[in-house]
UniProtKB/Swiss-Prot annotation:
It comes from the Bacteria. GO terms for molecular function: RNA binding; structural constituent of ribosome. InterPro entries: Ribosomal_Su5_D2-typ_SF (IPR020568), Ribosomal_uS9 (IPR000754), Ribosomal_uS9_bac/plastid (IPR023035), Ribosomal_uS9_CS (IPR020574), Ribsml_uS5_D2-typ_fold_subgr (IPR014721). The gene is rpsI. It comes from Afipia carboxidovorans (strain ATCC 49405 / DSM 1227 / KCTC 32145 / OM5) (Oligotropha carboxidovorans). GO terms for cellular component: cytosolic small ribosomal subunit. This is Small ribosomal subunit protein uS9. Belongs to the universal ribosomal protein uS9 family. The lineage of its organism: Bacteria, Pseudomonadati, Pseudomonadota, Alphaproteobacteria, Hyphomicrobiales.
Length: 158
């Protein structure tokens, strides 16, 4: 019996001495920018961030011009606010496909990933907020024999 206890004690000692996961490294290009792609519905955003004054440019236009609705601008700012980095990074994004809501979600996803490339320590905060998770919901396809994906044609008894 004492032999098993001794081996179990050794096992617990081994578990406590296990090495930690390797630290994530900063991924930055030659110009000092972090790059990431974000996706949402049909939209794909390519996002570059670099230290700056907090200016956000989408498709060569200011964010206030491109996303006129305040809700969409707030959506894009969420990962920066969650990481408490307002006014510290300039964001340049090119986004294509989908509508404005999907594009805003794609830019948000790209900003979140780029922030983790620039500051790997922010990964926990952004992951907890759900900003790093790709929203996989897409439009359901239309089926034959139906008016839309699920809606049937109008039915008449007589």
């Amino acid at each position: 019996m004492s032999d098993t206890m001794q081996s179990l004690d050794q096992l617990s000692a081994l578990k406590t001495a296990a090495p930690d996961a390797p630290k994530r490294e900063k991924k930055v290009d030659k110009q000092g920018r972090a790059y990431a792609t974000g996706k949402r519905k049909d939209a794909v955003a390519r996002v570059w961030i670099k230290p700056g004054s907090g200016k956000i440019v989408v498709n060569t236009r200011d964010v206030e011009v491109y996303f006129a609705r305040p809700v969409l601008r707030m959506l894009i700012q969420q990962p920066i606010v969650a990481a408490a980095r307002q006014g510290q990074y300039d964001v340049v994004a090119t986004v294509a496909g989908g509508g404005l809501s999907g594009q805003a979600g794609a830019v948000r996803h790209g900003i979140s990933k780029a922030l983790t490339h620039f500051e790997p320590d922010l990964r926990g905060v952004l992951k907890k907020g759900g900003f790093l998770t790709r929203d996989s919901r897409v439009v359901e396809r239309k089926k034959y024999g139906k008016a839309k994906a699920r809606r049937s044609f109008q039915f008449s008894k007589r």
